[in-house]
From Swiss-Prot:
Protein name from the UniProt record: Probable GTP-binding protein EngB
Gene Ontology BP term (one): division septum assembly
Gene3D superfamilies: P-loop containing nucleotide triphosphate hydrolases
Cofactor(s) annotated in UniProt: Mg(2+)
Purpose of the protein: Necessary for normal cell division and for the maintenance of normal septation.
Gene from which the chain derives: engB
Keywords: Cell cycle, Cell division, GTP-binding, Magnesium, Metal-binding, Nucleotide-binding, Septation
Source organism of this protein record: Rhodopseudomonas palustris (strain HaA2)
Pfam families: MMR_HSR1 (PF01926)
């Protein structure tokens, strides 16, 4: 499911994410964003798609990003820095598509996300997490259109791959690739992951190292 990646990138990704990753900032509004520093990659997705679990699995720190069984709990942009010299920062974005949230709250989150996407020069890529059990939903497609409009590079990451039969996952990957052909800002490579088993994490880490190389 996941593309073959240069072993050197895999190893460099392993070393980078084996270092000390830590929380540095929480921004409830665009006015409270931290100073731009290094390269930023953000994680977006529907509420309870597994963003926090994926960040924890990436960094090997079970409690780095707070996980919650309450959809829509993350209402801020959460920033994490890596070890000295990593040059990489992770951003956990508010979950979207939570039907029980008030209209005012949804409007506030939407405004924050849009402003962040359009005005952050250090933002290199957004990883859009899609639940591998369900595939793309209308609300996901809306976010992809927003990213296209903002001209922000993004890449699809299918989560919870361990909870889907192989044949179903293959169908989900094919359907997602077909849908992405209509989106100009989408990075063509699709990743499949499992935070529980660690599947796909080496490839995702390597993808970020490749981004760092491209920006240097």
């Amino acid at each position: 499911m996941t593309e073959t990646i240069d072993p050197d990138l895999i190893e460099r990704g392993r070393k980078t994410f084996a270092g000390d990753w830590h929380f540095i900032w929480a921004s409830p509004s665009i006015e409270t964003l931290p100073p731009m520093d290094g390269l930023e990659v953000a994680f977006a997705g529907r509420s309870n798609v597994g963003k926090s679990s994926l960040i924890n699995a990436l960094t090997g720190r079970n409690a780095l990003a707070r996980t919650s069984h309450t959809p829509g709990r993350t209402q801020e942009l959460i920033f994490f820095d890596g070890p000295p010299g990593a040059g990489l920062r992770l951003v956990d974005m508010p979950g979207y598509g939570y039907a029980a949230a008030s209209k005012a709250k949804v409007a506030s989150w939407t405004s924050l996300i849009h402003k962040f996407l359009q005005g952050r020069a250090t933002l290199a890529r957004v990883y859009v997490l899609i639940d591998g059990r369900h595939g793309l939903k209308d609300v996901d497609l809306d976010i992809l259109k927003t990213l296209d409009k903002a001209a922000v590079s993004y890449q699809i990451v299918l989560t919870k791959a361990d909870q889907v039969k192989a044949a179903e996952l293959a169908e989900r990957v094919d359907a997602t690739r077909t849908a992405l052909a209509k989106h100009p800002a989408a990075f063509p490579e699709l990743l499949t992951t499992s935070s529980r088993t660690g599947a796909g994490m080496p490839e995702l880490r390597a993808a970020m190292i490749r981004l760092l190389d491209e920006r240097r």
